[in-house]
C-alpha cells in the first residue's frame, strides 16, 4: 500500500533529481568568469614575453647574469651572496634554475594549447613554433643539452636531447615555420596575428625575415658541424634575412611592467660594461664608445673601462661604481630590441669567414671601418 507508493515517489524523485542535475550540469559547474575557450592568438601573446624581459627581475636573471659570457656586460652585484658566480662557471642553483623556470613556463603551457586549437596548422601555430624555437635556441646556447624533441603535452618529465639532436630538431621545425610564413606573406597582414603582435603588427614578411635571421644565427652557433651549418646559413640568406633598420624587431609594449630592463637596472649599480668589449673598442679607437658607455671615474688612463668577468675578488657593487656604465640615454619606455638587422650583417660576415671554398657566395661580407 502506502509504503509502495512512497517507494515509487522516492524513486521518481531520485530519477528527476538525477535528470535535473545532468541537464544543468554545465550551468552548475562552469565558472562564469573564466572563458571556456581562449583564442589561439591570445595564448600566443602570452608566449611573446620570451622575446624581451617583461620586467627588471627577468632582466637580472637572464640578461644580466649570463651577459658576462658574451663579453658585453658584467653584473658586479651581491645577488649571488657576494660573488658573481656565473662568471666563475659555478652559478648558484637557484639562480640557474630561474632561467629554466621563466623560459619553460612561458612557452609550453600555451604552446600545447595552441597546438591543439590550430591542429598544428596556420600562422598562429607557426608563430607559436617560432617563439618556442627562439626561446629554446637561447636555452641550448646557455645550457647545452636540453629537453626539446621529447617534450609532449601532459608529460610531467621529458628526456634531454643531446646537442646534435636538439639543434637539428629546431632547424627542422624552423624550416616548417618559414614555409608557412612565406605563404602567408603573399596574403598581406594577418589580422589574427596583428591583434596581438607588438613587434611587426601582423606582417608575415617581416616575421619570415626574422625567422631566416634566427636560422642564420643558429647556423653560426653550430659552425663546428661545417657542412651542415654552411648549408643552413646559405638557405637562410637565400630565403631573405633582416637587411634594413625598418626590418629590426622591437617589443613596443611600454605600459605596465613591460619596460626596458637595462634602463632600470643600470641605475641600480647592478650592471657595468664588460672589460672585453671596452678593451676591443679602446684598441680600435672605436668612435661608438661614447654612445655605448659612460666614462669611468676610477682614475684609469682610458676613458672607458669595464669590469672583468671572473675577477678573483668577490665583486661588491661599491668596488665598481666608478667603472664605465651602460649609456642609457632614454627612459624605461624605450622599445626593447629583440633582433637588429645589424646582427644579420655580422652573421653573414662571420659566415663568409668560416665558409669553405665551395661556398655559393650568398653570405656576402660587410665592410667595417672603425675610423682612425
Regions found by a protein language model. Name each.
Residues 1-19:
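Sec-dependent bacterial lipoprotein signal peptides
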Residues 38-41, 75-372:
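Structured, solvent-exposed acidic/aromatic patches
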Residues 17-20, 54, 184, 356:
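Hydrophobic alpha-helical elements and their junctions with loops/disorder across both membrane
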Residues 21-75, 102, 113, 117:
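Membrane-proximal, proline-rich intrinsically disordered regions
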Residues 7, 12, 28-33, 177, ...:
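A generic signature of intrinsically disordered, low-complexity regions enriched in glycine/proline
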Amino acid at each position: 500500500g502506502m509504503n509502495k507508493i512512497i517507494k515509487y515517489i522516492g524513486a521518481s524523485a531520485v530519477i528527476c533529481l538525477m535528470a535535473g542535475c545532468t541537464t544543468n550540469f554545465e550551468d552548475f559547474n562552469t565558472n562564469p568568469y573564466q572563458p571556456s575557450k581562449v583564442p589561439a592568438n591570445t595564448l600566443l601573446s602570452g608566449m611573446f614575453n620570451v622575446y624581451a624581459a617583461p620586467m627588471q627581475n627577468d632582466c637580472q636573471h637572464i640578461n644580466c647574469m649570463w651577459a658576462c659570457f658574451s663579453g658585453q656586460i658584467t653584473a658586479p652585484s651581491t645577488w649571488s651572496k657576494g660573488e658573481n658566480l656565473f662568471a666563475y662557471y659555478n652559478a648558484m642553483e637557484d639562480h640557474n634554475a630561474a632561467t629554466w623556470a621563466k623560459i619553460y613556463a612561458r612557452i609550453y603551457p600555451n604552446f600545447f594549447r595552441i597546438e591543439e586549437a590550430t591542429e598544428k596548422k596556420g600562422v598562429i601555430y607557426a608563430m607559436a613554433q617560432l617563439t618556442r624555437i627562439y626561446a629554446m635556441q637561447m636555452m641550448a646556447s646557455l645550457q647545452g643539452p636540453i629537453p626539446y624533441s621529447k617534450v609532449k603535452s601532459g608529460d610531467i618529465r621529458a628526456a634531454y636531447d643531446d646537442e646534435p639532436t636538439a639543434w637539428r630538431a629546431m632547424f627542422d621545425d624552423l624550416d616548417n615555420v618559414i614555409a608557412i610564413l612565406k605563404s602567408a606573406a603573399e596574403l598581406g597582414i594577418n589580422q589574427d596575428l596583428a591583434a596581438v603582435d607588438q613587434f611587426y603588427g601582423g606582417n608575415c614578411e617581416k616575421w619570415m625575415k626574422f625567422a631566416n635571421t634566427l636560422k642564420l644565427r643558429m647556423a653560426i652557433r653550430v659552425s663546428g658541424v661545417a657542412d651542415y651549418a654552411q648549408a643552413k646559413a646559405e638557405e637562410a640568406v637565400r630565403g631573405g634575412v633582416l637587411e634594413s633598420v625598418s626590418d629590426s624587431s622591437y617589443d613596443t609594449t611600454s605600459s605596465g611592467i613591460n619596460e626596458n630592463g637595462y634602463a632600470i637596472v643600470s641605475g641600480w649599480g647592478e650592471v657595468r660594461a664588460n672589460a672585453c668589449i671596452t678593451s676591443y673598442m679602446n684598441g680600435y679607437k672605436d668612435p661608438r664608445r661614447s654612445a655605448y658607455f659612460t666614462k669611468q671615474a676610477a682614475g684609469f688612463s682610458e676613458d672607458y673601462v669595464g669590469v672583468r668577468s671572473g675577477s678573483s675578488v668577490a665583486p661588491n657593487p661599491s668596488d665598481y661604481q666608478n667603472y664605465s656604465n651602460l649609456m642609457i640615454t632614454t627612459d624605461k619606455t624605450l622599445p626593447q630590441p629583440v633582433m637588429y638587422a645589424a646582427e644579420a650583417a655580422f652573421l653573414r660576415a662571420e659566415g663568409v669567414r668560416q665558409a669553405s671554398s665551395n661556398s655559393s657566395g650568398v653570405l656576402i661580407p660587410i665592410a667595417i671601418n672603425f675610423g682612425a
